[in-house]
């Protein structure tokens, strides 16, 4: 178990072909993130020494990737997007493998009618990497359980945007190294337990009534007539309605699935830890390497007037290390509810 706040990082620059260009021996600072349904980033500041300086001078964006290890375990990798060389210092910024999808387009036209969103997402990813693969795998944990009607046209739109669109209607995804993980929004596997003692800076329990909806309507494109509805008047809350347009939805069935998915995320009222990023204690009983967006942690707190004991989804992780030590922060959000209808 590698405790939060006690890790030591190392960094390597790796060529697209797999060979190590150079280790970054003199790290001044390291920051890396993991994010649900989007591209994560990393940033390192290095003091070049000896031969390392010449090798760092050969770093090239997109050709080379940054690989970060924490206590000897690889925790992050992705292509270098920006590099800056100054006197006695080199700074590198990188993004995870999902950033490639923001530079790829659909390479053939296709129509999906009633396919699970994970199958559609898998097709988008494989199609994007088919002409030129930087090295990837796809891991489907479970089908999303949401059917999607989608249509993609060759050379129209960025694949990354198409994938984010699927995440708006019932799918979750994240990157772990060179693996893209696809999962349903209600994926609830837990990686640990957190209590009040694990939050040394305190926390805030919040109930977000602005997110509540008892009836959700999803429309397709204006001219399509496609519509899906989920829910109605609730015996406890009354009637709160939301109507949204999802132009990529092409069938009534997929619109209905999208409406149900959106209502599951908005009903009942979401209760969560309101801090955008909660700092963990070094004694927290969680393995930092296993803090992956999409997975969950069980949280129990009695420190406020609103006790909370529930499973929360990891929405993001931010790890920083510099001369003052390491900080590990997590973003925790409510799980989609089981509507039972």
Range-by-range predicted roles:
Residues 67-94, 299-329:
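Short beta-strand and beta-hairpin "edge-sheet" elements
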Residues 14, 31-33, 45-47, 69-71, ...:
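A structural detector for beta-sheet-dominated domains
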Residues 32-52, 89-100, 218, 268-284, ...:
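Oligomerization/assembly interface segments of phage tail-like spikes and tubes
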Residues 86-90, 95-210:
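Charged- and aromatic-enriched interaction segments used to assemble
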Residues 2-17, 188-324, 336-341:
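Acidic, small/polar-enriched beta strand-loop surface segments
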Residues 23-29, 80, 146-150, 198-202, ...:
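A broad structural signal for short, well-ordered beta-strand segments within beta-sheet-rich domains
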Residues 1-119:
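Beta-strand-rich assembly/attachment modules of structural machines
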